[in-house]
Amino acid sequence: MKPVYCFSILALLQIFTVVVSESNWPTLNFTLEIASRAQRDISKLLPISQITTVGISLSSIFRNSGYTVDALSPLYDLLNGGNEAIMIDLYWNEFTSQWQLCPAPFPSNTTYNMNDVVDLSWENNDYQCQPGLSTENIMGIINSYIRDTNTNIGANFLRILFNLKSIHYENSNRTIDLQNIYKPSILNPVNIGNDTLNDTIASLGSYIFTPTVLSQYQSDASHVEKASSGSSINSTQAISYFYNQSNIIVPSLDTVLLSEYKRVSAHISSNELVNSSRVYQFTSYDTDLIFFNDVVPLVVENTTTGVAGRYCNELFNAYNSTGVDIETFNNLSLTTRLRFIVDSDENPFTVDTLSKFVRCGYSAIFNGTYDVGVNSSSLDFSDEVDEFIPYGFWSWSPGQPVDLNDTNSDSINNASMSSNNTDDSNGNSLAFKCVVLTETGWSVANCYDRHVIACQNSTSRNNWVLQETNKRNYFEIDKGDCPEGYTFSIPRSSTEMLSLQATVKQRNVPYPIWLDLNDITVPNCFVSGGPYAQCPYQRTITTNKFVRMIAPSFAVGVVVLVLILIENIFRTNPIQTNRKRYWKKAIQEYYNKNDFEGVPS
C-alpha cells in the first residue's frame, strides 16, 4: 500500500476514533432505565442498608406455573426490569436431609426422570414439582444477569431473601409408613436439592457480599475514622461521617459495587424450621456466607396486618406547628435495619399503596397472584409486575424523568449558558434539564423557572430549610442562597425524602421546589453538583468543542484525499514510458536492417 494511502486511512481512522470514543454511551431508550440509574447514582454514597427497592417472591410464580424450571423463564426479565430482591421459600426435607424448592417430598419408591413434572400431595395440598428444579437454576439466572450488567453504568445490588421452612413429620404410628414412602434407601437414593444452606448460593462466588466482607470493612472503617477525626471534611465525607454514626456500620453502595465489586447479598428473612431431632444444623460456613438477623437485622411486614401502613402514616405526619420531628428521621437513618413489606392475595399492592410503602422506606416484595389464573404462565405474572415498576421509586414521580426537549440543546451545554438558548413562542428561555420536587416526587422542569430551593444541613441529613422569599432559576443558585451550615442539595434516601416533604408541609411551601439534580451536560445522565457537574460516564462534548477537536484531523484528511485525486488524474509512469520507447525503437531498427519485400521463403 502506498504511503499516501496509509496517511489518508490513518487520518480518517483518527476522526472515526474521536467520534466513537466520545459517544461510548449506551442508548437509554427507556424512562425506567434512566430513572433507576439516576436513583442509584444519587444513593451511591449511602449505606446499602438505606437502599429501598422492589422485588418478587418466587412462590407467586411457582403457585401459578408449578415448581418447574420453565416457571423461572421470566426471572431474568424481571431482574432486568427493575426488581432487585428475590424472596425464596426453601424447604428442609427431613426425610432426605436436603434443601429443596418443592414444598412436598418425593416418594422414594418411584424412579424419576429429572425433567418430569410429578404430581405430589403433602399436608392436604397438591403440587406439581420437577425433580430437576433446584436453587442452582435460580442462581444460574442471577449469575447471567450479573455478568450482563457488570459495568459502571448497569451494575446494581441484589438481595436474596430465604424463608426457611420444614417438610416435617411427627413420630407416630404413621412414622414407619411415611419413612418407607419418602426416606431414600440404598437401592433407590433420592438426591434432590442441597445438603447445606451455603451450597444453595455458593455458585454466585465472588459476587456475594458476605458477613466476612462486612466485618473486614467495619474494622477498616474504625481505623479511618480515628485517623480522620478533627480534620476538615468535604460534602462527600460529611455524608459518610453522618451515616457512620449508625448502630451498625455498613459500607456505601458505591463501595460495595465499585470497590468491593460485590453484586448480591443473601439474608434469612424468616426461620420457620420445626425444632426436631432431624432439624437442619447451621454451620460456620452458613454464617460466613449468609446474613442472619444478629448481624444485619431484617424485618418483614405483611400487608394483611396493617402494621406497615400505620407506621408509614406516622412518618408522613412527623411534624407539628413548631417544626419537623428531625430526631425521628435521624434515628431512622442511623438505625441499620432492612425493612420489607410483602403483599398477599387478600391484600395485594395497588399503585398507591406500593408507592406509599416504598416512600416510607420499605422494600416491596410482590407475593400476590394479581388475578393471574393457576393455568396461566409465569410470563403473565411478569407482565402484571411490570405495570407496578414505575411506582416503585421513592424518588421519581411515575413516568419521570421525561424528555421535554425536542430541539438542539447545545446552547445549554455551552459554557456561557445564557446565549443562543431555546425560546418559546413568547420569547421565554426553555431548558427542561433540571429536577424539581413535586407532591408526587421528582420531575423534570424548565431550568429558567424560578422556584424555592431545597437547603440541607451538612451534618444532620434530615434537617432542611426552605426560604419562600428566596426564589431562583436553576442557573442563578449559588452557595450564598442557603443559610450557613446548609447547602443546595437533594434527598439521597427515602428517609431524607420523607423529612424534606414533611418540611414542605410544615412550612406550607408551595411545590415545585428546586433539587440539586440535572442532565444539562449529557442527556439522560442525571448528576448533582450544579449546572456544570460532569456525567461520570462520558466526558462532556459540545458542538463547538467537537468541531475544534476533529478540525485538524479533518483538514489533513481532506488535503490527503485531494493529493490522491490529483495523482490519479495526472499520473505518468516514467519507467513504463521509457520501456515503450525502447522497444518501439528496437523494432524499427530491426525492420530497417531487414527490409524484405513480400513473404520470405
From Swiss-Prot:
Superkingdom of the source species: Eukaryota
Region (Disordered): 405-425
Extracellular side: 22-549
Low complexity: compositionally biased ranges: 413-425
UniProt keyword list: Glycoprotein, Membrane, Signal, Transmembrane, Transmembrane helix
Residue spans crossing the bilayer: 550-570
Signal sequence annotation: 1-21
Residues carrying a glycan: 29, 109, 173, 194, 198, 234, 244, 275, 302, 320, 331, 367, 375, 405, 414, 420, 457
Entry GO CC: membrane
Gene that specifies this protein: MTC6
Family of the protein in this entry: Belongs to the MTC6 family.
Protein's UniProt name: Maintenance of telomere capping protein 6
Membrane topology term: Single-pass type I membrane protein
Keyword Glycoprotein: yes
Ranges per topology, Cytoplasmic: 571-601
Subcellular location: Membrane
InterPro entries in the record: Telomere_Capping_Maintenance
Function in brief: May be involved in telomere capping.
